[in-house]
Amino acid sequence: ESMLHMRNGRSSKAHIYRLPYAVEVYKNGLVSKIIVSGGRNIGNANMVEADYLKEKAIEFGIKKKDILVENKAMTTWENMKLSRELMIKNNLLGECTNIAIVTSSFHMRRSIMIAERVFRDDGVNIVSLPGEDNSTRRTTWFTNEKGRVRAIGEVEKIIDYVKKGKIDDFEII
């Protein structure tokens, strides 16, 4: 059994870039459940990220019963911790052997490292499935200001998470 964890981040554009990819993965039978995660308010939708993503996922054809909603998290760390608690509450963690993370490439390393820490004792494989936008693709992030700013911000967050002991230190090669 596989679970897909999709987090929105700070933008309501996740339904444009990440959600279609998550839907494709689901419809191809690679995952049986989707967790949408995020508690930040989306002004244009007048709701929090996860609730908005759930509505969009249903519009895209995901069965309501296959969507779990984590709508309290304000950080990536909280996304993972609260999603794990949601899986435990719904008796899914023991059944699940793979957790696929859908987020952008620039955010993937930290997301995977946090997921590996949070799910460390649960016997699951963490898989990355980057859902891309145009400014932060692995091959283009450095060609535009938005991509460079996001990449630098992500490095700063990784350093902060290492200092706080939330992820393990590692060598950049």
Residue ranges and their predicted role:
Residues 135-173:
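C-terminal capping/extension of enzyme domains
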Residues 1-151:
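A structural signal for short, hydrophobic/glycine-enriched beta-strand patches
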